[in-house]
């Protein structure tokens, strides 16, 4: 479910706090896990508005930010190597794999510093079973939404007003929501797992 989309000219803890407070005022009582890229101020805002929320770095964005600075011929191999980090069975195994990859790829002038800097925000990820992790690092639904917005922008490069842009985004959002009909496999098992890690906070119908 999409709770909202926002058009802003800045990112800060104050800005994100206003968004999160709006969610709270609309009735969103709790957030179990916040998965996001390096949006400035978001982690601080979450800690202030929803202090019990577990914050995680978005694996998809970590991968993309790493591949962005790599030559095309090396991308496929590096993408495969990065799986050794986020599919590791334990945190210590992921760290060990990261150190090995750093040594391997430093010879090709590829930096994995982004992963080291975000390791604390990736750490909670490893306590979940592989099927639950896959839900977290697979961003198909979000990507389909972003692609829809990109097509909107490509078809009309200039919007006369902010309201015109908001209208276009709203219609695009409604169109993509209608296509979201499938459910996650073994959702009941995943909810049961979350209920163990977040007791009395998961509502299972």
Spans of features found by a protein language model:
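RNase H-like nuclease fold core
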Residues: 1-36, 40, 44, 48-52, ...
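Generic alpha-helical segment signature
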Residues: 9-13, 35, 71, 75, ...
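Hydrophobic/aromatic-lined pockets within catalytic cores
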Residues: 24, 28, 47-51, 67, ...
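Flexible interhelical turns and helix-capping residues at alpha-helix boundaries
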Residues: 24-27, 35, 71, 105, ...
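A generic hydrophobic-helix recognition signal that picks specific residues
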Residues: 30, 54, 133-137
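Conserved beta-strand -> loop -> alpha-helix junction used to position metal-binding or nucleic-acid-contacting
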Residues: 33-40, 45-81
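Acidic/histidine-rich catalytic cores and adjacent linkers
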Residues: 84, 88-205
């Amino acid at each position: 479910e999409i709770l909202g989309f926002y058009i802003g000219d800045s990112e800060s803890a104050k800005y994100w706090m206003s968004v999160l407070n709006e969610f709270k005022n609309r009735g969103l009582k709790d957030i179990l896990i916040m998965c996001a890229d390096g949006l400035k101020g978001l982690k601080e805002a979450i800690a202030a508005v929803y202090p019990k929320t577990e914050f995680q770095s978005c694996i998809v964005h970590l991968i993309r930010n790493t591949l962005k600075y790599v030559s095309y011929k090396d991308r496929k191999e590096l993408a495969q190597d990065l799986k050794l980090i986020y599919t590791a069975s334990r945190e210590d195994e992921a760290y060990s794999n990261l150190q090995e990859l750093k040594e391997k790829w430093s010879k090709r002038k590829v930096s994995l510093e982004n992963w080291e800097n975000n390791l604390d925000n990736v750490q909670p990820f490893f306590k979940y079973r592989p099927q639950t992790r896959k839900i977290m690092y697979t961003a198909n639904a979000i990507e389909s939404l972003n692609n829809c917005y990109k097509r909107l922008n490509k078809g009309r490069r200039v919007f006369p007003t902010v309201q015109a842009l908001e209208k276009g985004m709203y219609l695009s959002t409604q169109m993509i929501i209608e296509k979201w009909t499938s459910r996650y496999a073994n959702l009941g098992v995943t909810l049961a797992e979350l209920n163990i890690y977040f007791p009395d906070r998961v509502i299972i119908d």
